[in-house]
Each structure stands twice: as C-alpha cells, then as structure tokens.
C-alpha cells in the first residue's frame, strides 16, 4: 500500500511539473518586446506584492486561500478564454508554492487555455529582482 501511495504522489508531482511554464528571462523579454502583453496575476501574499512586483501585474491574493481564489475568479471572469495569462507568486520555489497549483487549477477548470506559470526557482527577489528584470515599487495591495 505504501508503494502505491508513493507511486501515486510521484506521478501527481510529475503532472504538476508539466503545467505550462515560462522562465524569468523569457518572460522579461516578452514584456519588453512590442505586441500583446499577457494579463499577469500575482497569486501570492500581499507583503510580497507591496514590496515589489512585476509591472502591470494585478494582485489577486494568495490562491491557497478561498478569498484569493475568489478574487482571481472575479478578475479573470471578464477575460476571453483564450487570453494569455501568466501567474506568479515568488514566496518560495514555484514547484513547492502553495499558491501556484490552486490558481492554475482554477483557471483550467474555468476554461482558460493559455495559462502559464512564471517559474521562480528560489524566490522573487533572487530570480526576478536581482537579475534586474523590471519591477514596480510597492503599491498597496487592494485585497
């Protein structure tokens, strides 16, 4: 039984890691290039968003909490289902983040087809701010 559970959890983790992703370097280049920009949602904690965040990103709140998921649901409900959406948090490595998976699952269930996770290998400061990618200085999170 333990082997079955272990195999199931490993398989589940592998599926989670196969979700569409974008690397910080590629996303920064996309933001700086001309053309259509994706809608960007910060699905993490308010303290991180208030400190520094990706320019143009909207604060949805922690997707690990019902209020954060409802905020994200309301924010995307006006968007076309084929609109490009990028989610990020930055509290910890993205594959261990308590906020990324619930946010992606919600958008998938709602029928959004172009949702990506910004891969933050360590945290937002180290993987986005330190390399010099664009940030906006702290703005009060509305949630």
Predicted regions and their residues:
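Short N-terminal segments immediately surrounding and downstream of signal-peptide cleavage
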Residues: 16-34
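Rhodanese-like catalytic fold shared by cysteine-dependent sulfurtransferases
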Residues: 13-22, 50-87, 91-143
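Short hydrophobic beta-strand that contains or immediately precedes a catalytic carboxylate
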Residues: 39-44, 57-60
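Sec-dependent N-terminal signal peptides
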Residues: 3-13
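Short coil/turn segments at beta-strand junctions that form active-site/ligand-binding loops
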Residues: 36-41, 81-84
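Extracytoplasmic strand-loop-helix segments at the start of, or within, the mature domains
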Residues: 30, 44-55
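A generic local structural motif
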Residues: 24-29, 45, 71-74
């Amino acid at each position: 039984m333990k082997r079955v559970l272990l195999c199931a959890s490993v398989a589940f983790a592998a599926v989670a890691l196969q979700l569409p992703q974008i690397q910080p370097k590629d996303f920064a280049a996309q933001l700086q290039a001309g053309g259509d920009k994706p809608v960007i949602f910060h699905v993490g904690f308010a303290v991180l968003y208030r400190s520094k965040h990706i320019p143009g990103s909207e604060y949805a709140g922690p997707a690990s909490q019902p209020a954060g998921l409802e905020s994200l649901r309301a924010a995307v409900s006006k968007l076309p289902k084929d609109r490009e959406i990028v989610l990020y948090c930055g509290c910890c490595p993205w594959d261990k983040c308590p906020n990324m998976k619930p946010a992606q699952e919600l958008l998938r269930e709602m029928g959004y087809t172009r949702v990506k996770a910004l891969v933050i290998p360590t945290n937002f400061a180290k993987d986005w701010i330190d390399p010099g990618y664009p940030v906006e200085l702290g703005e009060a999170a509305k949630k």
